[in-house]
């Protein structure tokens, strides 16, 4: 007994020391930011690749592409649109614009998750500061940060997906085309703004409704995900929904102040429901944004060189289809967003765990 006790104590101290060294970290450190950014970028890329075919069809519906307007409004139309793409372009047609999507989504998702972690850590430094509005604000601000940095790539992606006239659409040609399009008359009239900057602003067509839509979208997405995590970790669900950890993993989790990980099915459900809630809240703004992004290609604006405003686009949509016009493609949106957000949050949480953050 006397011989075993010191050994046991030494062993315990050794393990405890190693664990402390391994797990001590600063959430504001460069290492943490890089790891969380990498986890976010990978999760976003996985999610977007999963739903790329649905994303292509949704963009064609949202932008009222003349070749696809007859298919809108029903799930049967979705199948018919998919057949049309398959016959004309094959498998490649479903992934048209996907290279631009990946170029955009990796930095977008990386910035979004990093910003969320940092803003949340600032607004909610400890459990007593936890509140619904702080969660909502953290998500909204994270979304605004990411969309500002990556918006031009999103515009290019939409244009690539919108094109149906050419079998092979080149990224460089689309970028040149957007830059050479007529710039905003308001900017052109200002003598102090250089001409190149006016045309660069073409890459921010639809940016304002994007920002307006991002506030509810990102805010509701992160808020709903966190809220559902709380529900699924409640005493009623916890025995079925929370992943069982070994003693060492549990000790490490506590020291790092990590959330208890959910089982796969629970994580996917919380992510999917969060995505549906955020999609519903922000969808009208997304419709306006998509129409603004392709407004320069519309026959009605091709010759008068008019840079349309949000109110003008909203009026056109309402005149064409009424209130339903602001929710065109929402059923596809639900089909798309459920697996996308579920996959995104699931991969992010698992990547964080594997990266030791």
Curated annotation (Swiss-Prot):
Q: Name one GO biological process term.
A: mitochondrial coenzyme A transmembrane transport
- Show the InterPro entries listed in the entry: GDC-like, Mit_carrier, Mitochondrial_sb/sol_carrier, Mt_carrier_dom_sf
- State the GO CC annotations: mitochondrial inner membrane; mitochondrion
Query: Does the keyword field hold Repeat?
Result: yes
Name the cystine pairs: none
Give the transmembrane ranges.
31-47, 103-119, 136-153, 208-228, 269-285, 325-347
For molecular function, the Gene Ontology terms on record are: coenzyme A transmembrane transporter activity
List, alphabetically, the PROSITE patterns matched.
SOLCAR
List the SUPFAM superfamilies: Mitochondrial carrier
- Where does the UniProt annotation locate this protein? Mitochondrion inner membrane
Query: What membrane topology does this protein have?
Result: Multi-pass membrane protein
Solcar-type repeats, residues:
31-122, 130-231, 262-354
Q: Does the keyword Transmembrane apply?
A: yes
Q: Which UniProt keywords apply?
A: Membrane, Mitochondrion, Mitochondrion inner membrane, Repeat, Transmembrane, Transmembrane helix, Transport
What family does this belong to? Belongs to the mitochondrial carrier (TC 2.A.29) family.
Its biological purpose: Required for the accumulation of coenzyme A in the mitochondrial matrix.
- Record protein name field: Mitochondrial carrier protein LEU5
Q: Which gene is annotated as encoding this protein in its UniProt record?
A: LEU5
